[in-house]
């Protein structure tokens, strides 16, 4: 279970800790970006933006804590009915390789904010930035006199570490982002324990260009939607539907812009399309 000294803190006090974590992430955004680029191949511009997004997630959660309210239901008799929030205890968070620090913050910030402890499993291919993120969180917790064990970062294989987290009897909620088949298995395991699971799984994201579209904006959106993160995203615009009256001119211009994209290492400021995360993906595309 989560440490009582954290669980029992008033929400505005927990908010202060989350604000400090967000500030520290922003202070170390360049270092976190470099680690994530080394791990994922993404451009430094992308990885720095993801680090800043993570900082923003902690601040957003902190602000929500400061304004949290517990509802009192209108009385229908000589009694008082109210809703209160209680910590779950231990939350398991299992994340993908494509945007690690942003995904980490999206799960860890709300879980910590709710007074819980978190077991964070980063993807096997991209653990470095998650480990660095964990050290920053530990630094803040230690400064506040709180147990650093409120966040444990557990890298390793999904079938070993992930399965242990999902099936552990003390894990009271599971958050997973990743493939649909794995998500189904996690949902079944969570159902066996009667604990909730939040699943963000794979999908296809079509872009639809209507006859009355702003073509310049549409072209820019299509390019960004499929080539950001080198297309390695569950929200990548992997299908394109263009109105027949625009089709030839739109696709022709799109092809010309694609030909002008600069492919290179993520550390090169001029790179627009960076390497794929793993040689298996490279071989599949090639």
Listing of model-derived features with the role each one plays in the protein:
Residues 35-43, 72-78, 268-274:
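Short linear capping/connector segments at secondary-structure termini
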Residues 6, 24, 43, 99-100, ...:
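Glycine-/small-residue-rich active-site loops that bind phosphorylated ligands and cofactors
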Residues 37, 70-217:
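Rossmann-like NAD(P) dinucleotide-binding subdomain of oxidoreductase/dehydrogenase enzymes
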Residues 15-22, 33, 51, 55, ...:
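Hydrophobic face of alpha-helices
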Residues 5, 23-30, 41, 63-66, ...:
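Generic secondary-structure signature for well-ordered alpha-helical cores
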Residues 1-68:
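Glycine-rich loop-to-alpha-helix module at the N-terminal edge of alpha/beta enzyme cores
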């Amino acid at each position: 279970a989560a440490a009582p000294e954290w669980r029992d803190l008033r929400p505005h006090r927990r908010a202060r800790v989350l604000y400090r974590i967000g500030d520290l992430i922003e202070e170390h955004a360049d270092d976190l970006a470099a680690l994530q680029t080394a791990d994922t191949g993404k451009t430094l511009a992308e990885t720095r933006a993801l680090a800043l997004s993570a900082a923003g997630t902690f601040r957003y959660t902190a602000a929500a804590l400061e304004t949290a309210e517990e509802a009192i239901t209108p009385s229908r008799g000589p009694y008082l009915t109210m809703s209160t929030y209680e910590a779950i205890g231990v939350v398991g968070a299992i994340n993908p390789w494509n945007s690690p620090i942003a995904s980490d913050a999206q799960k860890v910030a709300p879980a910590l904010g709710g007074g819980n402890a978190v077991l964070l499993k980063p993807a096997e291919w991209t653990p470095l930035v998650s480990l660095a993120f964990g050290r920053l969180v530990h630094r803040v917790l230690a400064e506040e006199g709180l147990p650093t064990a409120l966040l444990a970062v557990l890298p390793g294989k999904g079938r070993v570490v992930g399965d242990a987290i999902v099936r552990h009897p003390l894990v009271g909620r599971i958050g997973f982002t990743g493939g649909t088949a794995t998500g189904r298995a996690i949902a079944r395991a969570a159902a066996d324990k009667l604990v909730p699971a939040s699943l963000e799984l794979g999908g296809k994201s079509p872009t639809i260009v209507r006859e009355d579209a702003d073509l310049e904006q549409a072209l820019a959106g299509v390019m960004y939607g499929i080539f950001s993160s080198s297309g390695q995203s569950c929200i990548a615009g992997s299908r394109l539907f263009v109105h027949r009256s625009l089709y030839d001119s739109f696709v022709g211009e799109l092809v010309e812009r694609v030909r002008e994209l600069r492919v290179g290492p993520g550390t090169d400021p001029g790179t627009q399309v960076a390497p794929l995360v793993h040689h298996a993906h490279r071989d599949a595309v090639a």
